[in-house]
């Protein structure tokens, strides 16, 4: 049996941003700092809590129907990346984030280690059909994204996992450089 979970998050497991992940990403949102978004932020993404994914794995154990089959197991809330960031901020009780859109290919060139995934994966729609997992494994998506973020933040706060985003100024540097380049381009085009 093959289980194909997509982005799985939860207590001790990470959230994604286009640049920062995990506690750094959540700290940026909480502080109301601008958030880098790859492309126009309109590609679709799913993020499923690990507890829901675990139930699919349990449903596959000793299940003769599942033998030799493959299953997608992921969220059933299809979020644009823009909405993903907005809902994460909402769950934190933070202000709506200022989203700074930068082309995926440029982000990947600026920091391949952190942003290469924007070009390789995030810029594309990541939606999957869970119907076989629901039918054969008893999978159900029970933890909405906002509730899942709240659970993870509570866990991180209890375990010292919300890192200080001021310790990494890379996202701020990219945002400042991008905004300055855009202003120069507009000024030159207006001549």
Task: State what each model feature region is.
Residues 1-14:
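Conserved beta-loop-beta element that borders a ligand/cofactor-binding pocket
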Residues 24-38, 93-100, 131:
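A short C-terminal helix-loop "cap" of Rossmann-like NAD(P)-dependent dehydrogenase/epimerase domains
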Residues 16-25, 38-61, 68-69:
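Substrate-positioning beta->alpha
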Residues 7-10, 42-43, 78:
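Short, solvent-exposed loop/turn segments at secondary-structure junctions
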Residues 2, 41-54, 70, 81, ...:
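Conserved loop-to-helix N-cap of the C-terminal "lid" that shapes the substrate pocket in Rossmann-like
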Residues 1-4, 36-37, 72:
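A structural signal for short, well-ordered beta-strand segments and their strand-loop junctions
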Residues 156-163:
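Short arginine-rich
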Residues 59-118, 130, 136, 150-151, ...:
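Mid/C-terminal beta-alpha module of Rossmann-like enzyme folds, strongest
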């Amino acid at each position: 049996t093959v289980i194909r979970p997509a982005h799985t998050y939860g207590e001790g497991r990470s959230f994604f941003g286009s640049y920062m992940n995990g506690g750094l990403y959540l700290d940026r949102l909480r502080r109301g700092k601008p958030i880098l978004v790859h492309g126009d932020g309109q590609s679709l993404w799913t993020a499923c809590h690990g507890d829901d994914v675990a139930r699919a794995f349990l449903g596959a154990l000793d299940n003769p129907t599942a033998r030799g089959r493959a299953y997608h197991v992921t969220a059933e809330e299809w979020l644009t990346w823009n909405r993903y960031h907005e809902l994460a901020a909402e769950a934190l009780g933070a202000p709506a984030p200022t989203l700074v859109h930068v082309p995926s290919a440029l982000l990947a060139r600026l920091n391949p280690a952190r942003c290469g995934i924007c070009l390789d994966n995030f810029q594309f729609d990541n939606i999957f059909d869970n119907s076989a997992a629901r039918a054969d494994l008893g999978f159900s998506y029970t933890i909405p994204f906002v509730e899942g973020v709240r659970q993870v933040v509570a866990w991180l706060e209890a375990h010292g996992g919300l890192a200080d985003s001021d310790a990494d100024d890379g996202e701020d540097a990219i945002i400042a450089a991008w905004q300055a380049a855009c202003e120069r381009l507009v000024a030159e085009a207006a001549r």
